[in-house]
Every structure is written in structure tokens, then in C-alpha cells.
Amino acid sequence: MTIDNHRILQPSAANIRAAASALMDGRLVAVPTETVYGLAGDATNERAVAAIFTAKDRPRFNPLIAHFRNLADVAAAARVEARAERLAQEFWPGPLTLVLQRRDPCAIALLASAGLDTIAVRIPAHPVAQALLEAFGRPLAAPSANRSGRLSPTTAAHVAAEFGEEVAMILDGGRCPVGIESTILDLSGERATLLRPGAIAEERLTAAIGPIAQVSADARARAPGMLASHYAPDLPLRLDATGAAADEVLIAFGARVPLGAGLTLNLSPAGDPTEAAANLFAMLREADASGLARIARSEERRVGKECRL
């Protein structure tokens, strides 16, 4: 695949201003966050939000995450109660998304919430995302900058490989330091419910607010990441491999690596789950581009309690 690099720009002050201007015009901009790159549009503009769904080929029933500068901006759009305040104090800015009750009225486009009475909100920690939010002055709807069902992008080049003229520019903040999606926690009801495992382990959330329920398998999507096909590689994936063939890409972890693969990619030779999580999407993309027939994943590992590698 030929990658169009002319839209990849360094996040200088001038380019941040240009990105904010493009967003004001209803265009889309790719922006780095600490988790993955986001496909950002004006969260208050229904047409811009619709353009995100179209560019990603995303089902309209799958809500988007709205990104904010600070807690005061979040509170203007959503009802921030005691549990949310505790989590915000501990984990924001950072890779935690909270699903809260929308305020009425709410400036965020209803399409971003997929017509629900809730809204998914986050304050990103990445300095480029923060700078763009500050320059733009409004919340950004910013799901991962990939076509729906494909691997999430952790570099600007990954975004350029996915999108053409749908994106006005790609702000290059380097490789995303976390490399996996934010954890999503639903606080819109009486019980806190984990909707999507992610960068912040469930144990840390439980320590902050008490017991957390698990989402039921048949629940309607209240936030991104609840579709079975989410973030899948193109190649067939063989799990818990104890060996690998010459036509396979081996995704390994730790010092003990089976031999025989056509290509071996080690998530973390040192066995560090944090390093492995940061490398996961990039290495799956490399595996997809290898020209080999399958991916073999060695013995299952976890990041925290719930994020499997």
C-alpha cells in the first residue's frame, strides 16, 4: 500500500492552529493521544460527527468518545457525580473513559451518543491532544483513526495508510506511549459497569470506587469497543501456539520464544506487560503486512486483570 505522507505534519504551534481552523470548518483531523491516534471532529457539529462515522464506515449505533480540556468542560455536557469526581481526580488526564448521563440541553451532537441519553467522555493526557483542544476551544469527538473493525493506529503512518482526503491533516506526535484503548466505565446507573477493558486495570478502579459489574453479553452498545469484530487483524489468528510454521508470524512475549516462524515479533522480550501493550497494535499491523499466511500467538498473557495479549 502506498502511504500518503504529505498530510503528516509536526505539531508546531502554527500547525496546531491550522488543525483548529480545519476543525472549525467541519473537517476531520487525526491527532495523537496517549492510547491511540484519534480521528477528531467538532463534537458539537452534527455534520462533522456524521463525517467521522462515514470515514470509519462505523455503525451509527456505536457511540463516539468526546474528548475535553478539563473537568469543568465535561460537567457542562454531562452529570458528574461523586464517583466520577473521584475517578477524575485520580485518572484524568489519562486513558479512562466514563459514560455519564447527558445534560439537557447538551452541546454535544446527539449522533455522537448514538441517540442515547448518555455520553462517553475523556480528558486525554497527550500534550498534542491537549494543545489542540485548547486551540479549538470545543470538545472533540475522536474515535480511533482506523476503519471500523481494523487495527487501531499507534503512529501517524498507520493513519495515513487508512485514510486519504477524508482527513485534512495528521498531527504527528510520535508513537502512542500506551498503545491500547482507554478503559470504559459506565457510571450512568446505580452500579458502575465495565464496558471495555483497556489501559487502566479494573483493580485500580475498584480501589477508587468499590465493586464494578461486568457488562452483559447482550447489552446494547453504550460506548465504543463492544462489537465482536473490534480491532481484529486481517490474517487468521491461531492462539496459544507452542510452535510456529514458516508461513506464520509468531507474536511472542518474554524470553522463551518458539522457533520455526517465518517472522517473529516479540511484544516484550523482558516480559513487561506495559511494554507489550504499547507494542500490540503496531506488531499486529506489521504481521498483517508481512505477506505470510497466519498469525500464531504464543501463550496467553494479560495486562492487569483483563487485557489479554
Regions found by a protein language model. Give the residues of each.
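Extended, polar beta-sheet/loop recognition surfaces of beta-rich domains
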Residues: 308-309
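Active-site-adjacent structural elements in enzyme catalytic cores
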Residues: 1-305
